């Protein structure tokens, strides 16, 4: 089936249970799909843009209210939309980091955190992970002292993931922020796997910035994201232009420097807006998501030789698993080699696991029903048993 002459229709979630770690939280709501059709044209949301000519002042569609509501929902003073979380990192780093400045980043952080510092010619120093793959307040304090000794100043910024992308482990953001603020270091909370998935309140956590991903965790089209700030930091990170043309004398009103005036137009922002009521509601049911995740995790644990590498009991639906001692043993002699697992899952209508991966891999159960979770769990057990693995 084709969307048009040379593009196939994508029907992954319509035909399969999707376990892809980066896709499940970004699946669009029906409301977002309809809104995209109506507002998908490039500058459609600018139909009613009037003075002061800024995205977060537009009332039809209600973008002005949306920006206010998102900030309140996150326990922050102000919020802006950005074209993906990485642009939020870039905006914050661009505000505080200059050439040669040290910045602390948790050792499990996404590469875009590092690149946002590199773009400013800053210097990254990592907070080490513990033996059980956590970033702690104690290690943060030690690394801050290391930086002070090395550079003569405290880090200009600290990045911390609430839930990291490698293990899906939850880290002590509140404790880390408390330590950082003793040195007056602003704290950037990376919520790409939490904002839109589970309750997040920046005031309770004590962070200066919250960054969320619309297309990863807020049921929105790509690229989309949220950058929220405290009242103290908002005037810095959302600073307005002071530029004036030397020949023309041109000025540019209250356009914001960090996002080059306006950030999201058309499909990404209306999709984000349209899904927001559903997203606000669904975070209150994260306990149900964890219960469904547990069904799959426990089934995998029953397969002899399988290890859950993420913290256990699980606190998030993203899980890293090591099947070197189970499914990879099958792959050594199977005619399809490592591809036997994804092939067997595919025949059962389950997708999202990297084809060929039978050693260490990740999955995310977010958005599943209990019935689907039970089906996935039973399927893994069936594949294991069919291929001669022991079920405990």
Swiss-Prot record:
The modification N6-(pyridoxal phosphate)lysine is found at residue 216. InterPro entries: Aminotrans_V_dom, PyrdxlP-dep_Trfase, PyrdxlP-dep_Trfase_major, PyrdxlP-dep_Trfase_small, Sep_Cys-tRNA_synth_arc. Transmembrane segments: none annotated. One of its GO terms (molecular function) is Sep-tRNA:Cys-tRNA synthase activity. It is an enzyme of class 2 (transferase). Pyridoxal 5'-phosphate binds at residues 85-86, 190, 213-215. Keywords: Protein biosynthesis, Pyridoxal phosphate, Transferase. It catalyses: O-phospho-L-seryl-tRNA(Cys) + hydrogen sulfide + H(+) = L-cysteinyl-tRNA(Cys) + phosphate. It comes from the Archaea. Pfam families: Aminotran_5. GO terms for biological process: translation. Signal peptide: none annotated. Converts O-phospho-L-seryl-tRNA(Cys) (Sep-tRNA(Cys)) to L-cysteinyl-tRNA(Cys) (Cys-tRNA(Cys)). This is O-phospho-L-seryl-tRNA:Cys-tRNA synthase 1. The lineage of its organism: Archaea, Methanobacteriati, Methanobacteriota, Stenosarchaea group, Methanomicrobia.
């Amino acid at each position: 089936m084709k969307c048009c002459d040379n593009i196939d229709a994508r029907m992954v979630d319509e035909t399969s249970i999707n376990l892809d770690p980066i896709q499940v939280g970004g699946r669009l709501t029906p409301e977002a799909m309809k809104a995209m059709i109506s507002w998908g044209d490039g500058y459609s949301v600018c139909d009613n843009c009037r003075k002061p000519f800024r995205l977060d002042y537009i009332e039809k569609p209600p973008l002005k209210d949306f920006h206010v509501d998102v900030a309140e929902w996150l326990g922050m003073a102000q919020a802006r939309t950005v074209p993906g979380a990485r642009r939020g990192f870039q905006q914050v780093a661009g505000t505080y980091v200059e050439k040669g400045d040290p910045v602390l980043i948790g050792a499990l952080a996404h590469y875009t955190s590092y690149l946002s510092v590199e773009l400013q010619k800053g210097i990254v120093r990592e907070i080490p992970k513990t033996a059980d793959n956590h970033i702690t307040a104690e290690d943060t304090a030690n690394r801050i002292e290391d930086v002070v000794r090395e550079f003569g100043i405290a880090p200009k910024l600290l990045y911390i993931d609430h839930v990291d992308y490698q293990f899906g482990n939850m880290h002590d953001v509140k404790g880390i922020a408390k330590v950082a603020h003793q040195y007056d270091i602003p704290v950037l909370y990376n919520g790409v796997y939490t904002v839109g998935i589970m309750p997040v309140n920046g005031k309770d956590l004590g962070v200066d910035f919250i960054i969320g991903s619309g297309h990863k965790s807020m049921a929105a089209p790509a690229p989309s994201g949220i950058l929220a700030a405290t009242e103290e930091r908002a005037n810095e990170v959302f600073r307005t232009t002071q530029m004036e043309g030397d020949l023309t004398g041109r000025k540019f009103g209250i356009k914001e420097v960090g996002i080059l005036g306006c950030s999201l137009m058309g499909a990404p922002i209306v999709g984000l807006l349209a899904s927001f009521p559903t997203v606000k509601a669904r975070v209150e049911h994260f306990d149900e998501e964890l219960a469904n995740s547990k069904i799959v995790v426990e089934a995998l644990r029953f397969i002899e030789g399988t290890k859950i590498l993420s913290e256990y009991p699980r606190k998030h639906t993203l899980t890293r698993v090591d099947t070197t001692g189970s499914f990879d043993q099958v792959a050594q002699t199977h005619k399809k080699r490592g591809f036997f697992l994804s092939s067997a899952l595919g025949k059962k209508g389950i997708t999202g696991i990297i084809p060929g991966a039978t050693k260490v891999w990740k999955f995310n159960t977010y958005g599943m029903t209990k019935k689907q979770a039970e089906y996935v769990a039973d399927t893994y057990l069936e594949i294991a048993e069919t291929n001669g693995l022991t079920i405990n």
